[in-house]
């Protein structure tokens, strides 16, 4: 039971989040989790809490919440959670003074896991673009090309090929393989 109350909690947390009242959004999300542990909105609630934590700069908490989301085996949002982990590490790397390289590496690994473990996710294209961007920034065009070629062979009809082909062409151009880049 509790359908109406459950849906009210969901609507309230969405409203609070849209109003940028992050503490209230997180509180409603937690209340939903406590009172309706079997809710079909549970994964969405965890995702929302993680986004609240991420938006407020609490990357460690956001990573913990996103990790919890990736462990919900029936959730369709697991890839979204994995992508969020990558975003958090990337945010931490951008804010870091000295040890940014390690955080960028963790972000890269998180994005790679979206591609490897959640190929059904709507975030695969974004994740691959982020992976390639890391290689591109390091001027490691050969490895970026390898990533793109693997994606093109594994997902020849994916909906994110435009991003892949654009970046693939950029890297081929940088490798002086201009004929292939066309």
Language-model-derived ranges and their functions:
Residues 1-182:
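Acidic, polar-rich low-complexity tracts and alpha-helical solenoid repeat scaffolds
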């Amino acid at each position: 039971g509790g359908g109406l109350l459950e849906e009210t909690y969901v609507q309230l947390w969405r409203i609070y989040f849209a109003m940028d009242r992050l503490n209230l959004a997180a509180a409603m999300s937690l209340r939903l989790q406590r009172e309706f542990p079997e809710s079909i909105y549970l994964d969405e609630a965890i995702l929302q809490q993680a986004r609240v934590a991420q938006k407020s700069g609490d990357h460690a908490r956001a990573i913990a919440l996103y990790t919890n989301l990736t462990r919900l085996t029936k959730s369709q949002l697991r890839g979204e959670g994995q992508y969020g982990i990558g975003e958090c590490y990337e945010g931490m790397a951008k804010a870091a003074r000295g040890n940014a390289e390690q955080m960028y590496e963790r972000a890269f690994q998180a994005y790679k896991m979206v591609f490897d473990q959640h190929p059904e996710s709507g975030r695969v294209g974004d994740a691959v673009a982020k992976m390639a961007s890391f290689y591109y920034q390091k001027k490691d065009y050969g490895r970026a090309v390898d990533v793109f070629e693997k994606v093109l062979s594994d997902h020849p009809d994916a909906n994110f090929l435009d991003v892949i082909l654009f970046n693939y062409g950029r890297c081929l151009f940088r490798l002086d393989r201009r004929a292939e880049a066309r």
